[in-house]
A protein has these predicted regions:
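Serine/threonine-rich low-complexity intrinsically disordered regions
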Residues: 11-14, 58, 94
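Short, well-ordered beta-strand segments in beta-rich or mixed alpha/beta enzyme
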Residues: 2-9, 39-66
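Intrinsically disordered, low-complexity acidic/polar segments
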Residues: 15-17, 61, 97-99
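An amphipathic, aromatic/His-enriched active-site/gating alpha helix that lines ligand/cofactor pockets
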Residues: 24-36, 55-89
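N-terminal first-folded block
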Residues: 2-40
Length: 99
């Protein structure tokens, strides 16, 4: 399994627009085969900072995701909304255990 975690930043005055674009992206991505988890969370103490968490079954699922129409639309939205400070990392993980 692959875990992607990190954050992106948008200017606080564009958060509402970003929320709309993110909602479309999240809904479409969660329907993809191989997507185990896909979530964005706004930082409550740092306006404009959006934390991202993704879990993918395997590299093939992630590659299919990167080629989707909604990923292309998200890239355009990120550019148009001037997202910056993109800081994401990918990790190979096992299935974990309950805490």
């Amino acid at each position: 399994m692959l875990l992607i975690a990190g954050a992106i930043r948008v200017s606080p005055e564009k958060v509402a627009e970003a929320r709309e674009a993110a909602a479309r992206m999240i809904a479409a991505t969660r329907a993809e085969d191989g997507c185990e988890q896909y979530a964005f969370a706004e930082d409550v103490l740092d306006p404009g900072l959006i934390h991202i968490s993704e879990v993918w079954r395997d590299q093939a699922a992630l590659e299919r995701h990167r080629a989707t129409e909604h990923m292309g639309a998200w890239r355009i939205a990120m550019r148009d909304l001037a997202f910056h400070e993109r800081n994401l990392k990918i990790y190979e993980v096992d299935e974990g255990r309950r805490l």
